[in-house]
Amino acid sequence: MKIVFSMRAWGQYLHWQNEPETLARVNGLIQECTRTPFTGTGKPEPLRGDLKGWWSRRITLQDRLVYRVTGTAPDQSLEIAQCRFHYDR
């Protein structure tokens, strides 16, 4: 599965380079999303409203990984919209 970051999500991902424990958590969640996008750690939950079709997983108490899976196998992509803060539109 291909992993695609939005520009904002990539900047947020780079922020975690200074916090190794959180970076390891983010990397683990991303890897898990590629295998089992809708179950697993981080309390995966579908989002509603303007973010319908996207899912979130908890990174820390205040930070979320927001993502969606697009395409069909073998051409699926994991699109990451954000990996810091709470849900932004």
Which residues make up each language-model segment?
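PIN-domain endoribonuclease scaffold, especially VapC-family toxins
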Residues: 23-30
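Enriched for short, Lys/Arg-rich terminal
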Residues: 2, 8-11, 15, 21-23, ...
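Residues that recognize and position ribonucleotide moieties
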Residues: 2-3, 40
